[in-house]
C-alpha cells in the first residue's frame, strides 16, 4: 500500500512538472529519453542542509512537503529561436568594445586547459581570456590551512552567434568567465557586447537604458551601469508569456 501511494505521489508530481504546472503550461516540455524522476528528502535543520546536503538536480522539478522531485526535460518548442547573431550590430562598433590581441591568448589558441598544481602561470598569462575561460587546476589553501586542488572546466571562449545567448549576469562586460565575447560581424575581430546588444538579448528596445534621471536631470547612463542593469533584468519575452498564464489562472478563480 505504501509503495502504491508513493508511486501515485511521484506520478502526480511528474504530471505537475510535465503538464499541469505553471511553467509546464507556459513553457511546454517533454520528458528526456530514459529520464526518471529523482526524489530527495530535504533535511529539517538548516545547518544540516548547508553542511551535508547534496542533490544531483536535473533541469526541471518541484518541491512539496520538504521532498524534492527532479527530472530531466527537453523543450517542446519548434518555432523560431532568437540567436545571439540576430541581436548583434552589423555596422561599425566603437573601438572601446574590442579586446586587444595580447589580452585574448597567452599560448596556442587550441589550448583549453592549464595545470598549475606545480607552478602558477605568470600574471600576464592569467590576465587573458584564454586562461580565464579555460579549464584549470591549481593549489589553494582553506581557512583552516588545508591545501587542496581547485579545478573548473573549460567553457566556450567566443560565444557562437548561431545559438541563443547565454544568461547575462551583473558582471557582464567585466573580466569574468561569464562575460560574453563575440566576433564582430563587420571586422571579424573579437569584442565585448555593446550596451544595445545586451538590451536586445533581454528583450528590451534598443537604447532602453541610454538615459537615466540623476537629481531630476536626464543624463546618459554610464556603460558599466547599463550592462549591470541588463544583467540584473528579467527577459521581457519570458515575463510576457508568464503573464498570459497568470491571467488565465486569475480569470478562472
What are these regions (language model features)?
Residues 57-253:
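C-terminal target-recognition/interaction regions appended to catalytic cores
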Residues 1-84:
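Flexible, glycine-/basic-rich loop-and-beta segments that form/coincide
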